[in-house]
Regions:
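C-terminal lobe/hinge of AMP-binding adenylation domains
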Residues: 78-79
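Compact nucleic-acid interaction/catalytic patches
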Residues: 85
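Acidic, metal-coordinating catalytic segment for phosphate/diphosphate chemistry
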Residues: 23-63
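Nudix hydrolase/Nudix homology domain
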Residues: 3, 9, 14, 19-21, ...
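Unchanged
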Residues: 88-164
Length: 164
């Protein structure tokens, strides 16, 4: 992501093997507001965000793009896929605190510092027969942590790694 000043948007492109983070411009996102691509053709799915959200249970979560001194990115391996550390916000918890707590719990790192607020992403899924819309707040973080990374196995995380 070096050399992309002003780029504050991250696109998550998922394949069956891993999630890849790619920087894209804010103008690209704004031109696609409330659009979904179906068979490579844009289709507007909603014109009123509140009306759209009314069909779902809303959940807030937070996570981080965490870099160490070597400019390596912290990744977790959960459910057979590489992903970024993130998790659900507890009641009355500040979103920044949630992001740091989740990274600490899922990876065993400490000394996290939030350096930048990134974008929010949305994920739709079904849980126990109910439709859920999860909003995840993303933060760029740094750490000087040099200890052993510890995956949170009770959350299904089997590996934690720094990647270039």
């Amino acid at each position: 992501m070096k050399g992309l000043s002003g780029c504050k948007i991250i696109a998550f492109i998922c394949s069956k093997d891993l999630a890849t983070c790619l920087p894209i411009s804010i103008s690209e996102i704004m031109t696609q507001k409330y659009k979904v691509f179906i068979n490579n053709k844009p289709k507007i799915i909603v014109t009123d965000w509140k009306k759209f959200c009314a069909h779902y249970i809303l959940i807030e979560a937070a996570g981080g793009l965490v870099y160490n001194r070597e400019d390596e990115l912290l990744m977790i391996f959960r459910n057979g896929k590489w992903d970024l550390p993130k998790g659900k916000k507890e009641e009355a918890e500040e979103i920044e605190s949630c992001a740091k707590r989740e990274v600490e719990e899922e990876c065993g790192v400490s000394g996290l510092e939030i350096t930048e607020k990134l974008i929010d992403t949305y994920h739709i899924y079904t849980h126990k027969g109910k439709k859920v819309l999860k909003r995840t707040y993303w933060f760029k973080m740094t750490t000087n942590f040099e200890g052993v990374l510890i995956p949170q196995t009770k959350e299904g995380i089997t590996k934690v790694a720094w990647v270039k």
